[in-house]
């Protein structure tokens, strides 16, 4: 969802700028020390469910992570062509599932702004399974709960390790977003077929969408 259907600029701004500033103020330290401490801890728990958990970060930082996110909701936007793509998928009777590492509170905030849940069939948070998408157990649980035929499924993400997990599980078609954050340049030399605007994958899907 984040960096795939929605602009990652929102999340990056909150976690990389707003959180360090609030953490520095709460703990009476300078901004660079706050940023360094947070980055170090993020690296330590990266790839775990705690990394994505609002509850975990609220306890760790002593800050209200939900309210922090609510302060920047004007940055929540669809990525180029994403909304049109979801509408096309619905018209084409294709089953769509948002499989996300986002915490349920994060999903709620973004859905209040974008109404993204109305555009798909299911929204599944990895927190339901207590393991992130990087873990093969996530995919096994998803398959069992939603009767996924991995040989006929396409998975889109902005995270290469997550795509590795999807591929290893057997998802046949894996695509990576080349510019998940609208405020940063496109990524190059990516390990999976890459695209920016959703119209770019029309040919890949052997069909078409329009904005």
Question: Which residues make up each language-model segment?
Answer:
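N-terminal helical cap/lid subdomain that shapes the substrate entry/recognition surface
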Residues: 1-84, 103-105
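Small/polar loops that bind or transfer phosphate-bearing groups
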Residues: 7, 98-99, 157-158
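Short, flexible active-site loop motifs that bind/organize anionic cofactors or intermediates
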Residues: 24, 58, 72, 97, ...
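Short glycine/serine/threonine/alanine-rich loop segments
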Residues: 29, 63, 94, 148, ...
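Short, intrinsically disordered/low-complexity patches at protein termini
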Residues: 29-31, 56-59, 90-93, 121, ...
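Substrate-recognition element of Asp-dependent hydrolases with the DxDx(T/V) motif
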Residues: 63-77, 82-114, 120-126
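Asp-based, Mg2+/Mn2+-dependent phosphohydrolase catalytic module
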Residues: 87, 103-104, 108-211
């Amino acid at each position: 969802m984040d960096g795939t259907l929605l602009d990652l600029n929102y999340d990056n701004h909150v976690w990389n700028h707003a959180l360090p500033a609030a953490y520095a103020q709460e703990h009476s330290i300078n901004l660079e020390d706050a940023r360094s401490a947070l980055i170090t801890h993020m690296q330590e728990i990266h790839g775990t469910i705690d990394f994505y958990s609002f509850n975990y970060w609220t306890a760790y930082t002593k800050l209200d992570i939900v309210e922090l996110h609510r302060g920047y909701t004007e940055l929540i936007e669809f990525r180029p062509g994403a909304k049109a793509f979801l509408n096309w998928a619905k018209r084409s009777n294709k089953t769509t599932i948002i499989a996300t590492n986002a915490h349920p509170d994060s999903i709620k905030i973004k859905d209040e702004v974008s109404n993204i849940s109305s555009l798909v069939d299911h929204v599944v948070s990895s927190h339901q399974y207590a393991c992130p998408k990087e873990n093969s157990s996530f995919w096994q649980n998803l398959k069992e709960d939603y009767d996924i035929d991995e040989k006929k499924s396409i998975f889109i993400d902005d995270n290469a390790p997550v795509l590795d997990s999807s591929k290893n599980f057997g998802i046949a078609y894996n695509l990576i977003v080349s510019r998940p954050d609208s405020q940063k340049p496109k990524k190059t030399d990516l390990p999976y077929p890459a695209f920016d605007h959703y119209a770019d994958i029309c040919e890949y899907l052997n069909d078409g969408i329009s904005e």
